[in-house]
């Protein structure tokens, strides 16, 4: 195969893949890949088409997804041709690309300024008014033809149905679903056992295409307006004037927009907005940079897809590509199966990544992954690296088969009702037992400092540890331990001392260490504050905890099932017989956060455990989920759905600076 044939094949494969993604995004409201992956591939295609344009005919390039918007009008709504095209925006990822955009403007005019605003992740809309009345609303569609959604647009409360302006007017903007409203909808869907909506953008697009306008009204869509068609007809000559005009007529505009004179001010806004965007109640992944002076727009021109008068800056995601060498499963202390990826080593966010999580089999199936494929991986802050998408398949026809047997004991793997989780069916699986023993000795549990994972494996292999209770019987086997390689008198005495010291731990440590399903360290701390002593554990009335925010029916059911098993009863009794009757020791130093419940989300300047410790030391409690009973949500970078839920429930939101102020107030 010649170089030309290779390039042509690569370009056609990219075009086909992106066309499939475009169809899912624009027409099915069901995106197949994250924005970061889409942007990377469209940029790759664009560069190939530009570099090797002589290899292709005019028609082959003109029909590329880099040159047109791949959206179709639905048959459910009347098709409407736009009076002027509704174009998309070209993207920039670096300062150099923004400078290139500015240099292009300099060719037309020596004096200019810019208008900057958030890039809203919603659905583009064009709205016409006649004699001050909302007359017609049309989606962008493919940029030339859209769908008439007038009746649905009339259900959006912040879009005026009439305005104090009699001349014909066409305005354009973005319909979106606020993160708080998105969370409310999914909470209701959850209660009604309906499938949850994937993200606010999909929810907004799907809502706007509803045939029942009552559904649209109930979902509380919103809109930001930012553009006026034929602005000179209304004596408008800059974006700033257009914004004021829209605002005075009662349209909603983004409060976070600003004016900039040069690249330095643009860069300053981009840097500041990176932190500001996490506090907003709508999804945004970048900044739109527009030439402020409208009279130069015609001279700058446009492609079939993008104008040259504006560009969208997008923040660089923490993603890269590498080869998926192998897929394997691990079994956790509760028997839960996790699918994992072995990767060709790659540097990401300053770390060498060789392994990443694949979550579960359905995740692999949805992404169509298999061994040998080139994949995207992502890492943010302390989050475990994760495979997030497929770049290229090694073998198009093959599908990865689900694991059906436990690799450690060869027992059947059983599935939950949702088919998303698999568990090893053997409660005596050696790997489950091993993970339970390792967990019991871990830092957050009983903190047996002198016993690392390697030493525990040696003890298990030598028959010294079969259950967590065996830690407290090791002193009887001191001579056997000392006969093992690398275990001298001093190291053995340190191990035994560490085990003896653990008997002074707080009750929550041992509850967490018992590997009870759904019981993390935060729940264990709460349980310990109510149970008070390990000797109370087996007879405690767990149903009495249902009224507390930290405890749900799933946790209560798990606790009752655990204490009902004879082997677990015997384990607790053995611990008590070996003087491990731990009592609850409150860690608080002050009452500053007494009666306050905190949830933490996002990446902070210190490990999450640092902030959890501060909260507990000052009398506060930690919860893993936001609810109406949550006092504060502490947010860091890349805060996710918890932030939206907090807004929906009017929970107070703190960044790290505000938290520190609260701590010393």
From Swiss-Prot:
Keyword Nucleotide-binding among UniProt keywords: no
GO BP terms: DNA repair; DNA replication
Coiled-coil stretches: none
Catalytic residue positions: 119
Cofactor(s) needed by this chain: Mg(2+); Mn(2+)
GO CC term, one of those recorded: cytosol
Signal peptide: none
Keyword Phosphoprotein tagged: no
Enzyme Commission code: 6.5.1.2
Stored InterPro entries: BRCT_dom, BRCT_dom_sf, DisA/LigA_HHH, DNA_ligase, DNA_ligase_AS, DNAligase_adenylation, DNAligase_N, NA-bd_OB-fold
Record-listed Zn(2+) binding positions: 406, 409, 424, 429
GO molecular function, a single term: DNA ligase (NAD+) activity
Residues engaged in binding NAD(+): 35-39, 88-89, 117, 140, 174, 290, 314
Gene3D superfamilies linked: 5' to 3' exonuclease, C-terminal subdomain, BRCT domain, DNA ligase/mRNA capping enzyme, Helix hairpin bin, Nucleic acid-binding proteins
Enzyme class: ligase
Reactions catalysed according to its record: NAD(+) + (deoxyribonucleotide)n-3'-hydroxyl + 5'-phospho-(deoxyribonucleotide)m = (deoxyribonucleotide)n+m + AMP + beta-nicotinamide D-nucleotide
SMART domains: BRCT, LIGANc
Residue intervals of the BRCT domain: 588-665
Keywords: DNA damage, DNA repair, DNA replication, Ligase, Magnesium, Manganese, Metal-binding, NAD, Zinc
Family membership: Belongs to the NAD-dependent DNA ligase family. LigA subfamily.
HAMAP family the UniProt entry points to: DNA_ligase_A
NCBIfam families: dnlj (TIGR00575), PRK07956.1 (NF005932)
Function: DNA ligase that catalyzes the formation of phosphodiester linkages between 5'-phosphoryl and 3'-hydroxyl groups in double-stranded DNA using NAD as a coenzyme and as the energy source for the reaction. It is essential for DNA replication and repair of damaged DNA.
Official protein name in the record: DNA ligase
Organism: Metamycoplasma arthritidis (strain 158L3-1)
